[in-house]
Design a protein with these regions (language model features):
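Secondary-structure boundary elements
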Residues: 35, 42-46, 54-233
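Short Pro-Gly-centered beta-turn/loop motif in secreted/extracellular proteins
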Residues: 374-394, 477-490, 494-496
Length: 513
């Protein structure tokens, strides 16, 4: 009789909590999640019921937290398509090297101008995750957290954010906790007396890192790999490696965050890396390049994100469209909070962006509200060149002159407005400086002006690159005169991939950004 009464009271309490949003912050998001689950709703409800049936208040809360924040998570299939979405036959893994894969890609692109890697399918977790899958992850995560000696100091909220999540990015779903923990059984036995979770985490990180090696071939395989796929292929890109390390660490109750910069500020591409955290969920790694912004992935929705702020009809740049990240730039470096006056702020435009120059174009990397024609950005990196932008439809458009924030936080506007009395000259010798590859640590030697190639010099003026001179094939004179001293320049080889770096001119010499 006592048992029956207890069960009834629990059921009534659960029902009252679910019915009263004031007593349960998850009630509203869970209701929306269940609607979006569609035919899979019964599986999500079954998962919640099983967690509730354990009688474990923390497991119940954790299950509700997962479902409340599940919207937006899923497996993304990204493939090469034409501009109208027609799939093109291309798999980088069919080639031995990035060079071979790029040659094949270039041949396809020649026949299909504008083709690119695009998301062709998204299997949302709400619509595809089973109750068995979710409960297995929940149960194993709690078992690890509650039994491993180094995990005892970890608060519940930190456990929930960094150990409980069952996925790393947009990879296929997988039950990776048991196999990863099995592979780490020896290091766990060797550290049974360890109580410092960060110290143990560093050991696990070092142990797991070799499980997946880096190869640039995966730059052209943008679909994230599952744990099983990485175990089979043993290769991936930085995102894959970070996910593998996070899987390994979570499986044994160590804490790992996944940080990333969407676009490097002084080189091409982007980067993701793992960060070993302490029991309070704090920590950061070193930077492998110049970063304007560093973000940390989260499973939870962030109410202050651009995705949460924008209206349904508003479009935003791709890399800022997620609500599952927080800004941790200030944990890595000294930052600035500049207020930028926009040269262009159309009526009704609520957000402005700043962009960095990467892979031949300006890439938005941060956002701010527009107030009376101005935008104040927060915690952006120094020693970097930026361009203010707005997003119109699906296009990113310039909204002001580029500017540099120097190491002291001083803003230098590059309006190319200096007159002849304040002009400068340039003897062009280099199109790209020495750059250390963030993924491999290898030094990429500078690219010089070659006598057997032709080059064009561009100046950023009035919102676009303007051609202001050329170096023809075989010319020995590489001098340009009467250039604006406050200009931003770009020297591009004819027929190149446009990977040359932008620069300013100081005392007649190129300063690259």
């Amino acid at each position: 009789m006592l048992l029956a009464t207890t069960v009834l009271l629990l059921a009534i309490t659960s029902a009252q909590t679910a019915a009263d949003p004031k007593s349960d912050v998850y009630a509203g998001p869970i209701a929306k999640a269940l609607e979006k689950a569609g035919p899979n709703r019964a599986e999500i409800e079954s998962f919640l019921a099983r967690a509730d049936g354990t009688g474990d208040a923390q497991k119940r809360d954790a299950a509700r937290w997962l479902v409340a924040n599940m919207d937006g998570h899923g497996f993304a299939v990204i493939e090469l398509t034409t501009t109208d979405g027609t799939r093109l036959e291309f798999d980088a893994l069919n080639y031995k090297s990035l060079t071979e894969a790029k040659a094949a890609f270039d041949a396809i692109e020649a026949k299909n101008p504008g083709c690119d890697f695009r998301k062709i399918r998204f299997d949302s977790d709400l619509e595809h995750a089973s109750a068995d899958f979710l409960f297995a992850h929940l149960d194993e995560a709690f078992g690890t957290w509650r039994t491993m000696p180094w995990a005892k100091p970890i608060r519940y909220e930190v456990f929930r954010d960094f150990i409980l999540p069952y996925r790393g990015s947009n990879e296929p779903l997988g039950l990776w906790r048991t196999p990863a923990r099995t592979r780490l059984a020896e290091i766990c036995r060797e550290n049974e007396g360890e109580t410092d979770v960060r110290a143990f985490g560093e050991k696990v990180r070092a142990n797991v890192h070799p499980w997946t090696g880096f190869t640039d071939l995966f730059y052209m395989h943008p679909t994230d790999q599952s744990y099983a796929e990485m175990c089979e292929r043993k290769l991936g890109r930085c995102e894959d490696i970070t996910n593998m390390i996070s899987f390994g660490m979570r499986s044994v109750g160590a804490i790992c965050a996944s940080d990333y910069t969407p676009w490097w500020a002084a080189s091409d591409n982007n980067h993701a890396w793992e960060v070993v955290l302490d029991a309070n969920g704090q920590g950061h790694a070193g930077l492998a390049g110049r970063a304007a912004k560093v973000y940390r992935k989260t499973f939870a929705h962030q109410p202050d994100s651009l995705a949460a702020m924008k209206r349904e009809e508003e479009t935003v740049p791709k890399w800022l469209s997620s609500s599952h990240y927080v800004d941790v730039t200030a944990q890595y470096q000294t930052t600035s909070d500049p207020t930028i006056t926009l040269a262009r702020a159309p009526e009704g435009q609520r957000f402005a962006y700043i962009a960095v120059f990467n892979s031949g174009s300006w890439k938005p990397i941060d956002w701010a509200n527009i107030t009376q024609g101005q935008a104040k950005f927060h915690a952006i990196g120094r020693n970097i060149c930026y361009l203010p932008m707005i997003h119109v439809g699906e296009a990113d458009e310039p909204a002001g002159a580029p500017f540099v924030i120097d190491l002291d936080g001083i803003v230098h506007t590059l309006a190319a407005a200096a007159g002849t009395s304040d002009s400068t000259s340039l003897i062009a010798s280099t199109t790209k400086p020495d750059i250390t590859d963030p993924d491999t640590g290898a030094l990429r030697a500078r690219t010089i002006v070659k006598p057997d190639a032709a080059f064009e010099l561009f100046l950023w003026k009035d919102g676009a690159w303007k051609s202001i001179g050329r170096i023809e094939r075989g010319e020995t004179a590489h001098a340009f005169e009467s250039l604006p001293s406050d200009g931003l320049y770009w020297l591009v080889e004819d027929g190149s991939e446009k990977l040359e770096r932008i620069f300013t001119i100081v005392a007649g010499k190129q300063v690259f950004w």
